[in-house]
Amino acid sequence: MTDHRTRFLQLALDADALRFGEFTLKSGRLSPYFFNAGRFDSGAKTAQLAQCYADAIDAAGVEFDLLFGPAYKGIPLATALACAYAGRGRDLPLAFNRKEAKDHGEGGTLIGAPLQGRKVLIVDDVITAGTAIREALGIIRAAGGTPSGIVVALDRQEIASEQDRRSAAQAVAAEAGIPVIAVANLADLLAFAAGNADLVGFREPLLAYRGRYGTDTTG
């Protein structure tokens, strides 16, 4: 497992953003783990998280020249990532959307750098159903930008339904024709748990969950 994946999972565990136990998801599934990016709630935590994102993006080799953060969690993530890249000597333009259009001031739903003619990387925490990402894709194209990829913190690598054996990330990637980059995924989480004495007891529930809901790419 590459270093940024290990660093991210340890950071998430330390921040209580990654928790183990029994959690009922919005889908109704009973999950042995839960991820909440909202727990990266300080400058230091967010800065470290952004470095993990940047390392994952660089490892993937995707080409982009603008960062876009979908409202709401994508906004601070994209902003922190832009700061991380500035610290590496790459000053990237940044944009995001608001969910409610304004009829005064700058107006509209878009804030930040113009998207026209840009290769846009979408930055978010997770892809659950894909609704917010699909909305972001439409906004970017309508503004004259070209989506070039999507980056998220964690890919749960679980099927959308028994009828659609793809994950939400796989479905969005196929529909949009662009890569979805994850800082870490369920397979990484399993490897991380196996190497952590405090988490070994959660490995069997994780394996059982993957066996029931995992995509074909989690093995």
UniProtKB/Swiss-Prot annotation:
It catalyses: orotidine 5'-phosphate + diphosphate = orotate + 5-phospho-alpha-D-ribose 1-diphosphate. GO terms for molecular function: magnesium ion binding; orotate phosphoribosyltransferase activity. Catalyzes the transfer of a ribosyl phosphate group from 5-phosphoribose 1-diphosphate to orotate, leading to the formation of orotidine monophosphate (OMP). Pathway: Pyrimidine metabolism; UMP biosynthesis via de novo pathway; UMP from orotate: step 1/2. Homodimer. Its cofactor is Mg(2+). GO terms for cellular component: cytoplasm. Belongs to the purine/pyrimidine phosphoribosyltransferase family. PyrE subfamily. Disulfide bonds: none annotated. PROSITE patterns: PUR_PYR_PR_TRANSFER. Its EC number is 2.4.2.10. InterPro entries: OPRT (IPR023031), Or_phspho_trans_dom (IPR004467), PRibTrfase_dom (IPR000836), PRTase-like (IPR029057). CDD domains: PRTases_typeI. GO terms for biological process: 'de novo' pyrimidine nucleobase biosynthetic process; 'de novo' UMP biosynthetic process; pyrimidine nucleotide biosynthetic process; pyrimidine ribonucleoside biosynthetic process. Keywords: Glycosyltransferase, Magnesium, Pyrimidine biosynthesis, Transferase. It is an enzyme of class 2 (transferase). Pfam families: Pribosyltran (PF00156). Transmembrane segments: none annotated. Orotate binds at residues 34-35, 128, 156. 5-phospho-alpha-D-ribose 1-diphosphate binds at residues 26, 72-73, 98-99, 102, 104, 124-132. This is Orotate phosphoribosyltransferase.
